[in-house]
Design a protein with these regions (language model features):
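Substrate-binding pocket helix/loop in short-chain dehydrogenase/reductase
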Residues: 99-109
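Residue(s) in the substrate-gating loop at a strand-loop-helix junction
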Residues: 142
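Conserved glycine-rich cofactor-binding loop
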Residues: 21-22
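Conserved glycine-rich Rossmann-like NAD(P)H-binding loop of the short-chain dehydrogenase/reductase
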Residues: 35-50
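Conserved NAD(P)H cofactor-binding loop of Rossmann-fold oxidoreductase domains
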Residues: 91-96
Length: 264
């Protein structure tokens, strides 16, 4: 379907946020809404996003299970219509922590299906709308993508895949004028971090970021200058920046030692 773009001056910029009912997604939706954006708030928890939208004229909401490609198509058509999409925030995610063999197989599969395949579904379905607006994708990644974390094995694997997906699509979609970025926080004070509170790395490194910190990073990322050869990844918080630099310059044996000391 080829539809001419609507001039930007006639409408507010648009952002669609997955997992917008709670935590980081909710904080991002609130921030962009407070600054005059048209915000699509979607979550498997329909009641949460309905309450959050609260009848605000620039807030739209609905149910979205990111694992369902057909649901993605319906949501995008309903929210975007003949308009493009300025920003997609791929935030929906789940986490199961513990020793790998102690976590049941359905929980491992659920993390892969939501954290990775849900993001693949969203990127694939939203591309025509993003291309129309020369928009951006912001993928929620994690510091667990920097090196495999014992106790968070499958979760970290999904986030490492998200990191790779971000890099590939940012290069592949550049000719269409679509930027792809990732946000890489360490542990954030949300229900998800609470679920991982028994992981050794959470206990030793602590939880020093809030959902609002990540939302502010999302705002800066969306409004940052696009530099062709700059990394698409944005570390959130001082701890994460130090970890990212350390992982990039340290020999593998030293990185393994550091991870072992914090995660075991």
């Amino acid at each position: 379907m080829t539809v001419p773009p609507v001039p930007a001056a006639t409408q507010p910029r648009s952002i669609l946020v997955t997992g917008a009912g709670h935590g980081i997604g909710r904080a991002i939706a609130r921030l962009f809404l407070s600054r005059g954006w048209r915000v699509g708030m979607y979550d498997v928890d329909a009641a949460a996003v309905a309450a959050e939208a609260g009848g605000q004229p620039l807030a739209e909401h609905g149910t979205l299970d990111v694992r369902d490609a057909e649901q993605w198509a319906r949501v995008l058509e309903a929210f975007c219509g003949e308009r493009g999409l300025d920003v997609l925030i791929n935030n929906a995610g789940v986490l199961s922590s513990g020793r790998f063999v102690d976590i049941d197989l359905p929980a491992h599969h659920r993390q892969v299906e939501i954290n990775l395949l849900g993001m693949v579904n969203g990127c694939h379905a939203s591309f025509p709308y993003l291309a129309r607006a020369h928009g951006q994708v912001v993928n929620l990644c994690s510091a667990s993508a920097l090196y495999g974390q014992p106790g968070l094995a499958t979760y970290g694997a999904t986030k490492a895949a998200v990191k790779s997906l971000t890099e590939a699509l940012d290069l592949e979609w550049r000719e269409a004028g679509v930027g792809v970025r990732s946000l890489i926080p360490l542990f954030v004070a949300t229900d998800m971090a609470n679920a991982a509170r028994n992981a050794a790395s959470v206990r030793r490194l602590g939880v020093h970021l809030t959902a609002d910190d990540v939302a502010a990073a999302a705002w800066r990322t969306v409004h940052g200058r696009q530099v062709p050869l700059r990394s698409p990844h944005r570390s959130v918080g001082g701890q994460t920046r130090v970890m990212a630099v350390a992982c990039s310059v340290s020999p593998d044996w030293l990185t393994r030692l550091m991870v072992r000391q914090t995660a075991l």
